[in-house]
């Protein structure tokens, strides 16, 4: 009887020590870099960079870069890429690219739209 009690007590102590408590840990999904640096991330994270740097990410992400930097996003999933200032924005996956740089945009009239559809 004492052996069973000691084994139960030992199990109550040993199980929490060897158990995996990753779901209880606080995770930092936002990596922020400012100044002349860069922020890099992989997986489902958000990378924000400002100043003369760049933000790079792969996977499910949002990349924002401002100032004299660039933002590049590549991965197998959809991405949102925003760039402003003297930087450039490139996206190698199925996503949306928004930039403050002037671009040649042609507005379609109703008849042109009907013809293109």
UniProtKB/Swiss-Prot annotation:
Residue ranges, compositional bias (Low complexity): 32-41, 48-57, 75-95
UniProt entry keywords in alphabetical sequence: Glycoprotein, Proteoglycan, Signal
Keyword Signal among UniProt keywords: yes
Disulphide bonds in the chain: none
Signal peptide positions (record): 1-19
Coiled coil stretches, renumbered: none
Residues covered by region (Disordered): 31-97
Glycosylation sites (chain numbering): 66, 70, 74, 84, 88, 91
Name of the protein in its database record: Chondroitin proteoglycan 7
Organism: Caenorhabditis briggsae
Encoding gene (name): cpg-7
